Amino acid sequence: DNVIDILANMGFFTQIERMADAGVLYQVISDFTADNADMNPEKISAIDMGNVFENLVQRFSESYDEEAGAHFTSRDIIYLMCDLLTMNADSYDEDTPAKTVYDMAMGTSQMLTCMEERIHALDKEAEIICYGQEINPFTFGIAKADMLIRGGDPENMQFGNTLNADKFKGYT
């Protein structure tokens, strides 16, 4: 169900039709099924897959100059924000069973990924539960796919307008 939700929100089926109409669908499928394109989790870690995914998101965003900010925020800026939020390392109680991170306008969810990384740098054993909501169906699909790739709970990624249909009331 999660994968179908992701594919539908990202317009995947429309893209398949476009590639077929353009005569490139066979080549794309051939490239992804080639011997050197083995993306088995035993060969590519979740972190590496996330980096590949982020690179694709960045390239996609750069192709839409006027809307790039709606899809992609530089990792440097995200890390700066995460560092500001985690400046007081003493506030991270190692006895707390789980830490939650919530992004009300998550875009592609890269802020959640970076925050998770920064918290793990402070406490390697921390259980981190990420939540997010996004109004744009395409970037929501990317965020939910990223959560699946990283092994998180995709149900914690919700589609909708946080201002008038908050799916995580009480999380802030």
Ranges and model annotations:
Residues A68-Y171:
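Conserved S-adenosyl-L-methionine
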Residues D1-A89, N156-A165:
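Non-catalytic, mostly N-terminal accessory regions of nucleic-acid modification and defense proteins
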